C-alpha cells in the first residue's frame, strides 16, 4: 500500500507498506546483486547506514545458488539475514544484455548462462516463479529492455510484447501468492514502462500497463547511454500517465543529481550500483562534491572523507589512511569506501524527505542538484 503524505510541485513525500515494514519515500534501494553488497557489506551494516530497502537480482540468484536453494533456506530474507523490505528485479535487464547469446519469442527468452554456457529459458511465468521462491516484498514484471538507440518499429513491437507479458506476469503472480506454501504470500508486483527514447511509445505503453492493476510502476530502459536531458524528457512525458495512487520507480538511476531531479519529477523509488562501484575505484561523495581519494594530495590529509558524515569510515579514519588502504589494495579500503558512499546516498534521501516535510525541497534542489556530482572545490 502506498500513501502520499505531502507534495511540493510534482515531488512526493510518502510511505509504502509491505510485509517487512513501512518504507519512507522517496527512497534509494541498496543493490545487493547476488544477495550481498559488493565490498564485504553485510545486512547488519545496511541497517547501520540507514538502508530501508535491499535489492537483489533474479537472474544471478537463479543461476547461483539457485532459487530452489533459497526457497529451501526459508527465502532470501532469512538466507542473507535481512529483515527489512526487499525488491527483486525480473532478470530481464541481465538476460537482454546477453545480446549475442539469446533468442526472443512470444513465450520468452532462451539464453546461455554467463557462468557455464548452458541454455536456459525464462519467460513471464518463470520470472514470477523464481521471484516467488526468493520471497521478496516487491517482484518486478518480466520485460524486454531494448538497446538505445533501436529502430522505432522494433521498439514498438517490443512494447506490445512486454504489455502482453505483463498480463501473464499478473496471472502467474496471483496464482503463486495464493499457494499455501508460498514464501511471501504478500509479495507485491510492479509493472515496467518501456519504449526506448520514443516519447509516443513510452506514453502508449504507460497507458496500456496502467490498465493492469499492479502495486506500483517503474520506468525502465533509461540511464543506459542516452543523454541525461533525454532521460529527464522521457520522465516528463511518462509521469503524467502514471497512476497517482501508486509508487513510481526509476530503475538504475543514478547520480545524486539524477535522484534529486527524479524526485522533482514525481519519482519515489531509485536504485543504482553507482555508489558502490565508484567507491571501489576511490570516487567518494561529500556534500561539497566528489573526491578521488587516490589523489596524491590526500596522502597527509588528517580529515575524514566528509566532516559532516557519521558513517563508520568518517567516524574513525582519515582520508590519508583510506588512501593508503586503497593504493595498497587492502580489502578494508573497499569496505569502508562502499559504506561511506551508501551512507551518503541514504542520507541524501533522508534530507530530501526532510525538505519535502518542511516545504523547502525547491531550495534543496537549487543548492545541491549539480553540485553533488561535480569534483569538490574545497581543496
Please tell me what each predicted stretch does.
Residues 172-182, 246, 352-364:
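Surface-exposed helix-capping loop/turn segments at secondary-structure junctions
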Residues 163, 172, 176, 184-305:
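Glycine-rich phosphate/ribose-binding loops and adjacent secondary-structure elements
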Residues 148-152, 156, 216-222, 331-334:
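Glycine- and acidic
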Residues 1-15, 23-32, 39-40, 143-149, ...:
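C-terminal extensions of enzymes
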Residues 121, 125, 152, 156-163, ...:
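Non-membrane alpha-helical structural segments and their capping/turn regions in soluble enzymes
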Residues 1-182, 296-299:
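Non-catalytic, usually N-terminal nucleic-acid engagement modules in DNA/RNA processing proteins
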Residues 21, 54, 89, 131, ...:
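Conserved, mostly hydrophobic/aromatic
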Amino acid at each position: 500500500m502506498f500513501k502520499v503524505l505531502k507534495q511540493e510541485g510534482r515531488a512526493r513525500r510518502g510511505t509504502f507498506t509491505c510485509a517487512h515494514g513501512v518504507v519512507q519515500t522517496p527512497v534509494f534501494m541498496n543493490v545487493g546483486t547476488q544477495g550481498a553488497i559488493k565490498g564485504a557489506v553485510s545486512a547488519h551494516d545496511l541497517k547501520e547506514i540507514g538502508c530501508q530497502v535491499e535489492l537483489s537480482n533474479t537472474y544471478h540468484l537463479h543461476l547461483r545458488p539457485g532459487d530452489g536453494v533459497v526457497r529451501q533456506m526459508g527465502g532470501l530474507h532469512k538466507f542473507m539475514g535481512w529483515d527489512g523490505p526487499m525488491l527483486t528485479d525480473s532478470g530481464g535487464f541481465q538476460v537482454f544484455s546477453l545480446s549475442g547469446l539469446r533468442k526472443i519469442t512470444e513465450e520468452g527468452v532462451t539464453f546461455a548462462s554467463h557462468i557455464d554456457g548452458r541454455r536456459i529459458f525464462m519467460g513471464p511465468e518463470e520470472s514470477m516463479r523464481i521471484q516467488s521462491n526468493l520471497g521478496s516484498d516487491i517482484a518486478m514484471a518480466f520485460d524486454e529492455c531494448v538497446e538505445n538507440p533501436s529502430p522505432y518499429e522494433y521498439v514498438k513491437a517490443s512494447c506490445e510484447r512486454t504489455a502482453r507479458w505483463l498480463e501473464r506476469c499478473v496471472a502467474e503472480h496471483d496464482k503463486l501468492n495464493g499457494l499455501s506454501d508460498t514464501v511471501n504470500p504478500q509479495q507485491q508486483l510492479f509493472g515496467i514502462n518501456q519504449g526506448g527514447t520514443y516519447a509516443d511509445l513510452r506514453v502508449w505503453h504507460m497507458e496500456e500497463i496502467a490498465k493492469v492493476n499492479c502495486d506500483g510502476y517503474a520506468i525502465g530502459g533509461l540511464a543506459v547511454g542516452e543523454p541525461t536531458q533525454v532521460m529527464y524528457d522521457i520522465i516528463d512525458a511518462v509521469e503524467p500517465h502514471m497512476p497517482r495512487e501508486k509508487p513510481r520507480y526509476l530503475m538504475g538511476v543514478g547520480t545524486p543529481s539524477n535522484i534529486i531531479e527524479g524526485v522533482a519529477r514525481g519519482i519515489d523509488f531509485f536504485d543504482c550500483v553507482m555508489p558502490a562501484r565508484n567507491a571501489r575505484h576511490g570516487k567518494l561523495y561529500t556534500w561539497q562534491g566528489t573526491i578521488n581519494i587516490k589523489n596524491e594530495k590526500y596522502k597527509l590529509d588528517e580529515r575524514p572523507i566528509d566532516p559532516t558524515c557519521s558513517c563508520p569510515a568518517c567516524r574513525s579514519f582519515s582520508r590519508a589512511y583510506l588512501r593508503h588502504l586503497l593504493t595498497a589494495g587492502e580489502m578494508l579500503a573497499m569496505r569502508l569506501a562502499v559504506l561511506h558512499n551508501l551512507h551518503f546516498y541514504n542520507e541524501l534521501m533522508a534530507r530530501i524527505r526532510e525538505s519535502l516535510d518542511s516545504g523547502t525541497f525547491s531550495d534543496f534542489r537549487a543548492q545541491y542538484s549539480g553540485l553533488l556530482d561535480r569534483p569538490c572545490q574545497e581543496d
